């Protein structure tokens, strides 16, 4: 035996599963909505066309934005985490919920079409840390000037001599 043993995964909720090929056929007809519980970065990079991105913690708010459906299919990269959303989606919608077998990775492996970009974000992307300057209109030069000023504070304090601070 080598390395760290694989972590045991507790059994997830039971879920009716649907294959990527079956889902592709269902998506040709109205009534099916795909809910993708992957990371927002993964979703923006590639997702099933027409899918909606959301997090379980914002499921109720997301369902206010997502058009109602006759049935829902949940996925994530592998569908391991999406499985845990099945009973929650069913309870909140009162509609049948299926789990995509193998997740979005199985969809990709089957050579089925993909969409890219941030259309389909049902909730705000709050699933990752954003640096304070990300998403602002501050130029790189302005950010660099601020950092240089901040790094220069130690020298400025050393020259001042009236403050009583000592650099450790």
Specify the residue positions occupied by each region the protein language model found.
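Rhodanese-like catalytic fold shared by cysteine-dependent sulfurtransferases
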Residues: 1-33, 37-168
């Amino acid at each position: 035996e080598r390395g760290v043993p694989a972590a045991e995964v507790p059994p997830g909720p039971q879920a009716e599963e649907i294959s990527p090929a079956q889902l592709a056929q269902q998506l040709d007809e109205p009534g099916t909505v795909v809910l993708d519980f992957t990371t927002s970065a993964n979703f923006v990079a590639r997702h099933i066309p027409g899918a909606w991105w959301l997090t379980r913690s914002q499921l109720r708010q997301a369902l206010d934005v997502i058009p109602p459906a006759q049935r829902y299919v949940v996925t994530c990269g592998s569908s391991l985490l999406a499985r845990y959303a099945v009973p929650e989606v069913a309870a909140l919608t009162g509609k049948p919920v299926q789990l995509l077998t193998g997740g979005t990775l199985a969809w990709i492996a089957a050579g089925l079409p993909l969409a890219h970009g941030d259309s389909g974000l049902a909730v705000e992307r709050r699933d990752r840390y954003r640096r304070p300057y990300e998403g602002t209109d501050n130029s790189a030069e302005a950010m660099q000037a601020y950092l240089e000023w901040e790094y220069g504070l130690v020298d400025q304090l050393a020259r001042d001599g009236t403050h009583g601070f000592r650099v450790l």
